[in-house]
Amino acid sequence: MLESSNIAVPLRWRPMQPADVDQCVDIVAAHPVIGPRYGADIENLGRAWRHLLGSAAVNNAVFERPDRKHATIVGIGFAVFVRDKFIHEIKTPPLPWVGPELARRVVGGDSPVLTDDEVRDANSGAGLSEIVWAGTGVPEFEQTRDFYHLMVSSYVEAHRGFLLNELISAQAESVEQLLGGVEAGGLYWNPTHQDYEKAPPEPAGVFVARPHLVGITRKLALTRRGSWVSTLFDYRPPRFGFTRGEQQLLQTALTSFQGTDQELAGALHLSVPTVKKMWGSIYRRVADCDPELVPDSTLAESGTRERGREKRRSLLAYIREHPEELRLHSRKLLRQNLRQMTGE
């Protein structure tokens, strides 16, 4: 058994793959608090997650401890962008256990999870509302400092650059976890008052034992600037308007950073000439908006290797600091909303 704070535990995270789902469901099912909340609905969880993998509305992670021969999954994070109607429903008494409710609805064909088009439109206008479906680990790891820090850093990385309207955390499994969520910036949902509040509407032990919500809205985040959660609501609109295919190329290049066109083509199941054409389109979009970021972009297309590599490194460094460029969005809707905000 690992002690919580003083042992450095080598951990890493990556996106969940279909082959991971059964192990992740087993972690939830075996959890002494979360598992019983699901009851028979644990049978729906794997089917629901498999159905949603690859959706633009899903942000997920598996946390691994790397060993010499293989890596062991020790925790999971799974969050979804949902429709505002569902947010209203789960805030209305009687409150449900959200994880089982989501599993039932997704498997039953009544999914509240946004489609890719709905993610694009909400991220270009009213903003996105998200629920953390699951965020837990095996008992010997979930209380360690390293596990907590990795969960936070992966969550921040996955959510920077989105236009967020409301975030609701996973329903706490203990008073300690509940208080940790509030210290991070969350507020208690009072179903009677239909509002977020700084103090729980009942003793913390009672609050966490029943279905409950802790979350924060964009408006309320302005009052909690000292928390890391509030930083997720900092938003800048994208400048370049990359297509979805260009975003996927850039995201893949960021992951490998030094990936060649041949490697990128293999990862994306594209031909090398197609990848080269996409880079040319990307450079032209950037040059039209910010010529100094990729000067002499024609050189990159004409085969000047060293200049092309430097240009790519410069662009990827910018994209790494501006993840909004990789999020689904509609340039048309963004322009319309900007005109409305400025009164033009």
What does each model-identified segment do?
Residues 83-100, 253:
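A short, polar/charged loop-to-alpha-helix boundary motif
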Residues 2-44:
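Short amphipathic alpha-helix that is part of the acyltransferase structural core
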Residues 92-185:
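Acyl-donor binding region in acyl/amide transferases
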Residues 47-75, 82-89:
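A short helix-loop-beta-strand connector motif used in the catalytic cores of GNAT acetyltransferases and
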Residues 246-252, 264:
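Short alpha-helical "packing" element that flanks the helix-turn-helix/winged-helix DNA-binding module
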